[in-house]
C-alpha cells in the first residue's frame, strides 16, 4: 500500500511524500539518482523507458507532486524541475515462511519512504529581473 502525504512549505516548492513503499531503498535510490535535478517532462520520459520495478511508484509520486503544483499553486508543469528527491529506509515487515517439520523461516520485507520536491523555475527568472535592474 502506498500512502501519499502532500506538504507545502515555500511559495515556489511543492512536496509529495510516499511512505511504506514495498521495495528496497537501495533499488529506489538507483532510480532517484538518475532523475534528480531534471525537468518534470524529461523525468517522465526517463521513468517510462527504464525497465525497473521501482520506476512505477516514483512515477506516481512525481505525477502527484505535479498535480499538486498545478491545482494548489497554479504552476505550469513545463516550468517544474525536481530540486530534491530522497529515499529513506522505512520499517521492515517481518513474516514467517512455513518450513518442514513445523519450523518457520523469517522473511524480512524492506520498505522505503520517498520524498519528491518540485521547484518552479519561472519564479526565479522573475526575481532575477528585479534584482539586476
Curated annotation (Swiss-Prot):
Which species is this UniProt entry from?
Answer: Manihot esculenta (Cassava)
Q: What is its main location?
A: plastid
Belongs to which family?
Answer: Belongs to the universal ribosomal protein uL22 family.
> Function of this protein?
This protein binds specifically to 23S rRNA. The globular domain of the protein is located near the polypeptide exit tunnel on the outside of the subunit, while an extended beta-hairpin is found that lines the wall of the exit tunnel in the center of the 70S ribosome.
> What's the protein name?
Large ribosomal subunit protein uL22c
Report keywords, A-Z.
Chloroplast, Plastid, Ribonucleoprotein, Ribosomal protein, RNA-binding, rRNA-binding
Keyword Electron transport included in the entry's annotation: no
Q: Which GO terms describe its molecular function?
A: rRNA binding; structural constituent of ribosome
Amino acid at each position: 500500500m502506498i500512502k501519499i502525504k502532500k506538504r507545502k512549505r515555500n511559495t515556489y516548492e511543492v512536496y509529495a511524500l510516499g511512505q511504506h513503499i514495498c521495495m528496497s531503498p537501495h533499488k529506489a535510490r538507483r532510480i532517484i539518482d538518475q532523475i534528480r535535478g531534471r525537468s518534470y517532462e524529461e523525468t517522465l520520459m526517463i521513468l517510462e523507458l527504464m525497465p525497473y520495478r521501482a520506476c512505477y511508484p516514483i512515477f506516481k509520486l512525481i505525477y502527484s507532486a505535479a498535480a499538486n503544483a498545478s491545482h494548489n499553486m497554479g504552476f505550469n508543469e513545463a516550468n517544474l524541475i525536481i530540486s530534491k528527491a530522497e529515499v529513506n529506509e522505512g520499517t521492515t515487515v517481518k513474516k514467517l515462511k512455513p518450513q518442514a517439520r513445523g519450523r518457520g523461516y523469517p522473511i524480512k520485507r524492506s520498505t522505503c519512504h520517498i520524498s519528491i520536491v518540485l521547484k518552479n523555475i519561472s519564479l526565479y527568472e522573475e526575481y532575477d529581473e528585479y534584482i539586476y535592474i
